[in-house]
Amino acid sequence: MAKKKATFICQECGYQSPKYLGRCPNCSAWSSFVEEVEVKEVKNARVSLAGEKSRPVKLKDVDNISYHRTQTDMSEFNRVLGGGVVPGSLILIGGDPGIGKSTLLLQVSTQLANKGTVLYASGEESAEQIKLRSERLGDIDNEFYLYAETNMQAIRTEIENIKPDFLIIDSIQTIMSPDITGVQGSVSQVREVTAELMQLAKTNNIATFIVGHVTKEGTLAGPRMLEHMVDTVLYFEGERHHTFRILRAVKNRFGSTNEIGIFEMQSGGLVEVLNPSQVFLEERLDGATGSAVVVTMEGSRPILAEVQSLVTPTVFGNARRTTTGLDFNRVSLIMAVLEKRCGLLLQNQDAYLKSAGGVKLDEPAIDLAVAVAIASSYKEKPTSPQEAFLGEIGLTGEIRRVTRIEQRINEAAKLGFTKVYAPKNALQGIDISQGIEVVGVTTVGQVLKAVFS
């Protein structure tokens, strides 16, 4: 067992004090001190459950077979992780309350129980409550263990007894170590419990999933160090009033950080959405103004999404701008370009923009679709339902090239689109599917003239 010493650290500058201070003497910040625990390692502190101490090995002698990924029955979940669950990995999943984090992990756990032993430790629900929720997810394998406990030492004891292949902690803010002062969810408790879980996962090849709460700003609650300690950080996103959920990787040591998985919450649990483009566009109205379609890339997957805009004359002194699912600063930049380079008088217009379906669009390739949607609403002229738009807009009004242009265009062709406006200088040497017309453009003014003339 490690020797622990409590100290107080300023979260602004890192100044340390043996006692709590209301104001930091180094940076003058108020109420910035939190209790931390200094851990001094003692001999033989970090060993596996079998009592084996870790030793240095040559890189060429490391057995790759021990890191064979375990596949779940959900291809969307496997994609986000980089191809499956890696033994010994520490995976942190965050999301808003009620978004479905526990449902997702319970569903994944039931599938992993067919391929190994699963220990599901919950500090938020009793075993009876979890059993009630699991009944709608299908049959449960015998190798699925439930444990309602908040004491980390007790959880460690059961890990030593059961020796699971997969461990689920729901949630990290409810687990506490009796060796550390402080309430559940405090900075010192979260950090120490995570460190112990990391040691257990790495020394015993236990794939560990940790549920983390988020703050009102949408970031993971607890110390920032929590995200640095784990191997993978996933965010489970979605509007509470929509059935669609998006699992997004923001850190992944074993795969890409650009992949997303899309699910739909149904009465029987989460169901994969294998063709998200069709889902996001199925409710689009033909002939509606203020609508444009873009082919966005989420990792290696092209997805067609709809950008909607509503431009109305302002009745107040200052025009109002509102965005949902789009970057506010990017929208403001595009509106400034439209006003300066294309002659659209938008300074006295309110503008409300959103991405339909709750998907977040934040890559430069959406610029042209945003500009067309704004112009469509302003001019009261609809776009063709078979047209899509690709391209980044520069401050001089030029259309810049985007990545994976060929893959984007072919995806639009698969879904029945007949025309795509794309950067002209990005179309050389690409293989385009039959039945789709690709219009190379150089300026945003050229696009607006072609679409609305």
Swiss-Prot record:
Transmembrane segments: none
Location of region: Lon-protease-like: 350-453
Database matches in Pfam families: AAA_25 (PF13481), ChlI (PF13541), Zn_ribbon_LapB (PF18073)
GO BP annotation list: recombinational repair
Alphabetized UniProt keyword annotations: ATP-binding, DNA damage, DNA repair, DNA-binding, Hydrolase, Metal-binding, Nucleotide-binding, Stress response, Zinc, Zinc-finger
Enzyme Commission identifier(s): 3.6.4.-
Residue spans, zinc finger C4-type: 10-27
UniProt key word Metal-binding: yes
Motif, RadA KNRFG motif: chain positions: 251-255
HAMAP family in the cross-refs: RadA_bact (MF_01498)
Biological role: DNA-dependent ATPase involved in processing of recombination intermediates, plays a role in repairing DNA breaks. Stimulates the branch migration of RecA-mediated strand transfer reactions, allowing the 3' invading strand to extend heteroduplex DNA faster. Binds ssDNA in the presence of ADP but not other nucleotides, has ATPase activity that is stimulated by ssDNA and various branched DNA structures, but inhibited by SSB. Does not have RecA's homology-searching function.
UniProt name for this protein: DNA repair protein RadA
Gene this protein is translated from: radA
